[in-house]
Design a protein with these regions (language model features):
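Flexible glycine/acidic-rich beta-alpha junction loops that bind and position SAM and/or redox cofactors
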Residues: 1, 16-40, 148-159
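Single conserved hydrophobic/aromatic residue that forms the stacking wall/gate
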Residues: 2-9, 13
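Active-site loops and adjacent core secondary-structure elements that bind or stabilize anionic groups
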Residues: 11-12, 76-78
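A conserved beta-strand-loop-helix scaffold within acyl/acetyltransferase catalytic domains
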Residues: 79-119, 127-151
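Conserved acetyl-CoA-binding loop-helix of GNAT-fold acetyltransferases
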Residues: 159-180
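Conserved GNAT acetyl-CoA-binding A-motif
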Residues: 178-192
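Conserved active-site alpha-helix within GNAT-family acetyltransferase domains
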Residues: 192-211
Length: 220
């Protein structure tokens, strides 16, 4: 427990632990660790020591109401070997997170290399004529993930302090499009699920193979 709590405290603001332990009910576990609420125990350990963690799940606003004037949009930049990354987050003055977006700005040389490797691999298949082109092209940015937290209510009953119904997600997407355009990208893709495609269509995205895509307006 102490090891896990120490490791979680070392995580940065863009990190999220999706699962700390597998979702198996305690009666079904015949041997070994039976603490199925391990995340809760780790977070209680951190709180009991008067410490904090920047990990996303620990900072969620959850069911709390959030005042609009208490939110600010932050952009964190970092680099990988193949992309320039932008982590956008809506945060309160206490550091709680109401929503975030992960934006990737792929390097042109990385896209070229991956495209060549993809073509080389698919050229060896018997069904080459049915192979789709590499799904990401030069000049295309990628929204990898969007999440907005807060109490979920029916739209007609949405409270003014409800994070999920104040357009925070839309503002994140539009800000990501602005950042991508300023960085010189002409198009932006988004990884979407079946249930969210309608939402992205309303934001100007259209279906385009594996992803949905939106043309970007040049920024002066």
């Amino acid at each position: 427990l102490h090891l896990l709590s120490r490791r979680q405290r070392q995580m940065c603001i863009r990190d999220s632990i999706s699962r700390m332990i597998r979702d198996i009910s305690a009666p079904d576990i015949k041997a070994g660790n039976k603490k199925v609420n391990l995340r809760q125990l780790v977070e209680q350990q951190i709180d009991s020591e008067g410490l904090a963690t920047a990990e996303i799940r620990h900072r969620e606003v959850s069911l709390a109401n959030v005042a609009a004037e208490d939110l600010s949009l932050e952009v964190v930049e970092y680099e990988t070997t193949a992309t320039s990354e932008r982590f956008l987050q809506w945060v309160t003055s206490q550091g709680k997170i109401a929503g975030f977006l992960r934006l990737s700005l792929p390097h042109a040389n990385a896209i070229a290399q991956l495209s060549e490797e993809y073509e080389a691999a698919t050229s060896k298949t018997a069904e080459q004529r049915h192979t789709l082109p590499f799904p990401l092209q030069a000049g295309e940015a990628m929204i990898r993930e969007v999440h907005v937290y807060g109490r979920v209510e029916k739209l007609q009953h949405a409270g003014i302090n409800n994070a999920q119904h104040r357009g925070l997600g839309t503002q994140l997407v539009n800000r990501a499009c602005e950042l991508a355009s300023r960085a010189g990208y002409q198009r932006i893709n988004v990884i979407s699920a079946v249930g969210t495609r309608g939402y992205y269509r309303k934001l100007g995205f259209y279906d385009n193979g594996l992803y949905q895509q939106r043309m970007l307006q040049p920024m002066s």
